[in-house]
Amino acid sequence: MKKFLSLVLALVMTMSLVTVSAGAKDFTDSTKIQYKEAVDVMSAVKVIDGYAEGDFRPTATLTRGAAAKIICNMILGPTTASALVADAAPYKDVPTNHTFAGYIAYCQKTGIISGYADGTFKPANSLTGYAFMKMLLGALGYKADVEGYTSPNWSINVAKQAINAGLNKGLKGDFNGVKAVNREEACLYAFNTLKATMVEYDKNSTVIVGNITIKEQSDAKEMANTGKTDGNIDKDGKMQFAEKYFTDLKGVATTDEFSRPATMWKVKSEEIGTYTDTADATYTKKVEIGDIYKDLGLGKSISAKKVSVLSLIHI
């Protein structure tokens, strides 16, 4: 995992964390958005959009039905997803003419979502961070029945894999999975999913011992990418979600005007914006190497020579 430090040697009054091109979505309430990079990118690829009034409403609660739409937009693309229809009511409270019926039906059939024991889905209800992370992990290829997402302790299994996949990266404060997800948090988690590596499973094997047949399910393994899209997100030979489903989206490593590490996002030739990477730790005074190790979560076996300062600002 890439880690860097920002050692600020003087107060910088005009330091900007983001430079946005004219092509980026300009919501009327953009100053209230905490996760601007995520919202800008997810808006640019048309996974999520604002309201007719021109605002985004970042703290508005995400509904279960809207979450299903986001997942479908991510997997199928917004054009194909918008044409989804439900041949039959997927749940008794989701008739075929419901606004989100097609999205909900698709997610149900692919095993990404499940309803309640009484046969309802409650599309207008909010959903927790755990529930949305579960949907995003399903989009990445994780199988709910194999990974324990349907067991009594499903939230623990979801939290572990979601955090390992980096789906909560950049979240301000600790991840609270029982709290209802708002719109900008949903954008952040979905944006991190675009950068996450997809998984797949080998075919199940069957072993017969006497009169007993045992079916063995393989573990999830990272999906390889040997095609031209490798490098759109990470040049690592692995298939990141966006490299499979958003092949026109590219994140280019660069630096901002203060020489800090940054990422320039673009769709085809249209630039979305350039966003400064979030430092793993920032210091404004003398610091001991032991404190740096602790802040970066590094073990004692790692040499101090491997800790690099990628942003050193002199004013």
Predicted feature locations:
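Conserved small/polar residues in nucleotide/adenosyl-binding loops
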Residues: 313-315
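Transmembrane and membrane-interface helices of multi-pass
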Residues: 308-311
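Feature responds to low-complexity, polar/acidic, surface-exposed segments characteristic
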Residues: 2-36, 49-68, 72-100, 110-127, ...
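Mature N-terminal segment immediately following signal peptide/propeptide cleavage
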Residues: 41-48
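Conserved redox-cofactor binding core of oxidoreductases
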Residues: 191
